[in-house]
Amino acid sequence: MDMKRHLKSALKQLGFDKPRKAQIIPMNTLDAGQDAIVIAATGSGKQVIYETVGLAHSDKLTIVIEPLLALIYNQVQTLQEHGVSVDYIDMTRSKEDIDKILHKVRKGKLNFLYVTPERLQSHSFIEAMQHLDVFMVVIDECHSITEWGYNVS
């Protein structure tokens, strides 16, 4: 299976010459606007899959729900180093910072917005997201739902 030109271009912008074989099908699936779940080992390149597709559709927003702050900071920094317009909202951000970030989002100035799961409990955040042109919502580290989430016993 081959990749479309816009995906190859996005992959190159992220610093990769070609995808791993196991990345191609999920990239093409997401690119077509379909849902996908990728279950793979740490270090296998799951992040590259959604970042490539999100970047290829940079006219729309990709929201990444990431429970681990260290990963948010690392991924945001890496994307910024590759010239990608990205920001994040977590509990360390002031209301003023969040308002500025959401303003950038509404103006279409961000390709990626990383948020922590608790942000989804914010009525104002959900309301702001309802009126945006969102291409993709990614749940990274989804195994943590069962590790840290609400469990009925």
Where are these regions (language model features)?
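Short acidic active-site motifs
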Residues: 25, 97-101, 124-125
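Loop/turn-to-beta-strand initiation segments
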Residues: 35, 60-63, 85, 109-113, ...
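Conserved motor-coupling elements within RecA-like helicase/translocase cores
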Residues: 99-112
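SF2 helicase catalytic motif II
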Residues: 111, 121, 125-153
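Walker A/P-loop
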Residues: 32-52, 63-68
